[in-house]
Structures are given as structure tokens and as C-alpha cells.
């Protein structure tokens, strides 16, 4: 009798623990962040196609889309463009693009976006007309409030010298941020020296004209918008019950996937103090932006990794990044077919690489694990909503 009682107690404890685990999973807030990097957006495009494919298999639903699984999707520059593609609704109120459409999009439009060189030394390298034309044609009059999930797309206003973050949650207090997604796409990708800044206007709650003078979102968040995306999620937690589990910065209840566009292994070659002692403005201009972006991206990853590890939730954060780009693949604006094919190979090879030196788990395996969590969480939320 005592043995039977002990077994029953053990079974009860296991069931209680399992139930608690699944309840916790159902309350998790999920965030996807995509870096900037121009044509190198092909790399996260490959990763997203793999992830969405896994979700479709697990849920036996060919129409499953990333926006169905993530509470917040954020991006800057080319990552902002991808964010708009997978969150903007089509005529059937489903995402304009599936993840499998991302890479073909770059192959079709990339050569035109990066082919209209102005040839001016004292002006932007490209005129930006095609970069503006494509979002206008594809996304039309769709605005931020219509996004199928929360978004976090960054830009920088050169007139006010302030970052501008386009999110659905800000619209109640700042309705002027309800801009057209096509304007946002150009603005977040308008990298200084590459494309002209973008001007457009919206209306305030009083009907007054509100003007924007915007450039690339990387100026506001540098290339990695992961912290921005998490910040948007935590701010929503104060008002939205669906985000309540991450109030007070409870990162244990946060599932974060951050996708990079690759770093330049050649740039990782060090410079000595003696070598740079006589550098002038021109020499520093050639490397200072890369240094700043690389350092900021590294520190963002370092901070997030540290926070999740300290909370014993390191499996809740995955940074997918290729750190050994070489040759033409390092260039944000080389949209030649040969280079784009190389970027596809980089993305496909990255899936087979280990997540870290200390772990045998590959990115492919880690993404499958993430997909399982996303799938289970979605089912739990759906079941809860049905009661």
C-alpha cells in the first residue's frame, strides 16, 4: 500500500510539473528580430524559410506563416523590409509574403535596387527610385495598424535627430506613426551614402500635418535590432494581457530569435596603434562605421546572452549569425546573380554549423527546437482561447 501511494504521489508530481511547464509555455512572449545588411538579407531569408517550413510540417498546415507564431517581429534596414513583407496583410488578410518568397524577392528586385548608380561622388550611390517603387506596388496603402502582429521597424529622423520606431502599440498615443508600410520600407533602408533620405507626412490626432525626414534604421539601432524588439515587447506588457508574463523584465518568459546578415571575416583583421597613428579622416571613415556596427552587434548579443544565462533560460535565446563572410559576400550592395547565389550557399551552410564552440547542436537543430516551442505555444494559446 505504501509503495502504491508513493507511486501515485510521484505520478501526481510529474503531472503537476508537466502541466505547469506547458502553462508557462503558453504564456511565453515570442520575438523575432532581423538585422540590416542590404542584399545580405538573403542569409536570414534562408533561415526564415527553413523555420517556417518546420512550423508548417509540425502543424500540418501549408498556410502557416511566421506572423502566426511571433508576438513581435522587428527589423532594421533590410531586416525592416523583411518584417514588412511577412507582417503586411494581403487581400485575404494573410501575410503578403511567405518566408519562401523572400530569397526570390531579392533575386528579382535586388539587381534593380542596386543598379541605378547616380555616378556622383558627392551624392548617394543609388537614386532609390526602384527601392521606393517596389513597396508602393506591393504594399499599396497598407499602414502600420494593419500589420498582422506587433512590429518594430526603426528609422532615424535627421531633422529632429531622434530615432523613429514604427510599432502598432505606439499608435494610440502617437497616431502620426501610422504611416504607410511602403514609406517605412524605404525609410528603414535609406542608408546614408547609398540612398537619398525619405520625406513624407502623416496627420496627428488633431489633423495637423506631421513631417518625417528619415534615413536607415541602422542609424538609430545600428544593425542589430534585437534589444529594440525586446523593448517593444516589454512596453506592451504594461497594457496588453497577452504580454503580461514578461512584466518586470521577466526574460524567463521570453523566447527570442535574432537573425544576423553575416559579418566580415576580413574586417576582423586587427589594426595596431602604430599602424593607425597617422590615419586621417578618410582612412577612419572607411572603417569606423564597420567598427561601430560590429561592436554594437557584439555587445547586443553579449548582453542578451548574459541576461538569459543568468536566468538559466539560455535556450530561450538564439542568435543565428555567420561570422566568416569573405569576398563579395561582405558587400551590402553586390546584387550580381553570382554573389546572390553565394549568399544562398552561405545561408544553407550556416544551418549545418554548430551554434557555438561549446555545443554540438547545429543551427538547424536549434531552429527545430525553437519551432517545436513556437508550435506548442500556439496550440496552448488556441486551446485557452476556446474556453
UniProtKB/Swiss-Prot annotation:
Recorded GO MF terms: monoacylglycerol lipase activity; nutrient reservoir activity; phospholipase activity
Highest classification ranks of the organism: Eukaryota, Viridiplantae, Streptophyta, Embryophyta, Tracheophyta
EC number(s) per entry: 3.1.1.-
Statement: the UniProt record of this protein carries the keyword Hydrolase: yes
Source organism per UniProt: Solanum tuberosum
Tissue spec: Tuber.
Top-level taxon in the UniProt lineage: Eukaryota
Active site: 77, 216
UniProt-recorded name of the protein: Patatin-13
Entry keywords, A to Z: Coiled coil, Glycoprotein, Hydrolase, Lipid degradation, Lipid metabolism, Plant defense, Signal, Storage protein, Vacuole
Signal peptide positions on this chain: 1-23
Family: Belongs to the patatin family.
Miscellaneous comment text of the record: Patatin have a dual role as a somatic storage protein and as an enzyme involved in host resistance.
Ranges spanned by the short sequence motif GXGXXG, renumbered to the chain: 36-41
Keyword Zinc attributed: no
A Pfam family the protein falls into: Patatin
Domain comment quoted from the record: The nitrogen atoms of the two glycine residues in the GGXR motif define the oxyanion hole, and stabilize the oxyanion that forms during the nucleophilic attack by the catalytic serine during substrate cleavage.
Motif (GXSXG): 75-79
Residues with attached carbohydrate: 115, 203
Main localization of the protein described in the UniProt heading: other
Domain PNPLA: 32-230
